[in-house]
């Protein structure tokens, strides 16, 4: 069994700092479990580890595709499992680090995913329908053809709704019937970092302000100038979509920043629903004075590291 340390938690809780510390101490490498960090040129809005941080600890599954390229959950699972196997084969400790619930669950629970190639024709038709009739119409249709999948997907997550309908239309089989679970070949410990909501929200707000100071607005502008449009999954994600009204003259910059803080709070509230399902969880308060020592002890006890 391959030893695998997962470090999970809501956005801005402190996963990066802890994972870097543990990776340096236990000769590890980090596999990102963040659906936004796979995109090149989207650095500030996705809170990627800095170049200096990535120079000290090898990172995987960051800067994998351009913002206009498709990147599926199945592809992530394939690449992440390959990276974990490679890290372990070289005698190092793999750390799976992030907050994207589907990515974490696919790897840690061993999801057997439908290998249905993208169908641009079907997807384009569904995207047109979403644009003309709203995401609610697509969600209502999904509830008809695949109520199990609909129950797992938030009504506002149009991208996942479209993918579920795309798989159904391409195969005639609901996506929920094409997924099973096979326990993965890992000896897993999951460290779940937590914070009281008011403390976490304050951290989120401070990070948004730091992102703005670091040039987030210019990053978004640069992506638009490169030709990446708002309807791309990358550009419609958290940290970027909030600026669309500003660039289209429908909102002030202050309103866009306020919306980004609000949306990030909402996202952080929803993330724990995924974390609760993960295997072998140890919960640690992210603001504990002895956090590093407690995390180190967990790694030593679990993986017999020294």
UniProtKB/Swiss-Prot annotation:
Pfam family, any one: IPPT
Amino-acid positions noted as binding substrate in the UniProt annotation, renumbered to this chain: 11-16
Positions that bind ATP: 9-16
Marked site: Interaction with substrate tRNA: 100, 123
Gene Ontology molecular function, alphabetical: ATP binding; tRNA dimethylallyltransferase activity
Position of the signal peptide: none
Cofactor(s) it depends on: Mg(2+)
Function statement: Catalyzes the transfer of a dimethylallyl group onto the adenine at position 37 in tRNAs that read codons beginning with uridine, leading to the formation of N6-(dimethylallyl)adenosine (i(6)A).
Record text on subunit structure and interactions: Monomer.
Protein's UniProt name: tRNA dimethylallyltransferase
Natural source organism: Roseiflexus castenholzii (strain DSM 13941 / HLO8)
Lineage: Bacteria, Bacillati, Chloroflexota, Chloroflexia, Chloroflexales
């Amino acid at each position: 069994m391959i030893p695998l340390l997962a470090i999970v938690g809501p956005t801005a809780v402190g996963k990066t700092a802890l994972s870097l510390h543990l990776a340096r101490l236990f000769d590890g490498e980090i596999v990102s479990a963040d659906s936004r960090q796979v995109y090149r040129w989207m650095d500030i809005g996705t809170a990627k580890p800095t170049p200096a941080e990535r120079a000290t600890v090898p990172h995987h599954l960051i800067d994998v595709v351009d913002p206009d390229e498709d990147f599926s959950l199945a592809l992530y699972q394939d690449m992440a499992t390959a990276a974990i196997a490679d890290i372990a084969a070289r005698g190092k400790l793999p750390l799976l680090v992030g907050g994207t619930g589907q990515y974490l669950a696919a790897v840690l629970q061993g999801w057997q995913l439908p290998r249905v190639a993208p169908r641009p024709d079907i997807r384009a038709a569904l995207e047109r329908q979403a644009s003309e009739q709203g995401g609610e119409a697509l969600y209502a249709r999904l509830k008809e053809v695949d109520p199990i999948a609909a129950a797992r997907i938030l009504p506002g997550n149009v991208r996942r709704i479209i993918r579920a309908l795309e798989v159904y239309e391409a195969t005639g089989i609901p996506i929920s019937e094409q997924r099973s679970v096979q326990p993965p070949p890992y000896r897993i410990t999951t460290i779940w970092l937590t914070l009281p909501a008011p403390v976490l929200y304050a951290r989120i707000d401070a990070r948004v302000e730091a992102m703005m100071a670091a040039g987030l607005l210019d990053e978004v502008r640069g992506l638009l100038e490169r030709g990446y449009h708002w309807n791309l999954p990358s550009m419609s994600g958290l940290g970027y979509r909030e600026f669309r009204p500003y660039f289209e003259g429908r909102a002030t910059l202050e309103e866009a920043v306020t919306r980004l803080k609000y949306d990030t709070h909402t996202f952080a509230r929803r993330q724990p629903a995924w974390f609760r399902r993960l295997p072998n969880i140890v919960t640690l308060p992210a603001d504990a004075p002895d956090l590093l020592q407690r995390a180190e002890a967990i790694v030593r006890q679990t993986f017999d590291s020294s």
